[in-house]
Amino acid sequence: MKINEIPTPFYIIYEDRLRRNLELINRVKREAGVNIIMAFKANALWRTFPIIKEYCTASTASSLNEMNLALDCLGNEVHSYCPAYTPLTINLYLDGSSHITFNSLNQW
């Protein structure tokens, strides 16, 4: 298929460039002794997740859907945050998250 035959809009991901950037991030991770957390807000292109999974060991989730996506596609630790937790959702977040951030002590 020629590029002008592909329906638009579309995204082109150059795997070599993605890997080069992930290698740089991985180097920073090693040299600084930190953990890199992938944010779905920065990249929601789920077809890249198998590659990202090779480099990132954690991800963020600002919703239950993002938490489930992280668990299903990345299978790593999930750092969750939410503007408001309900009695129902807090238990779901507790079951699927490795870390939970609260906006205030009152939210606890």
Where are these regions (language model features)?
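Generic N-terminal amphipathic, Lys/Arg-enriched alpha-helix
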Residues: 1-13
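Structured catalytic/translocation cores of nucleotide/phosphate-coupled proteins
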Residues: 9, 24-27, 55-56, 98
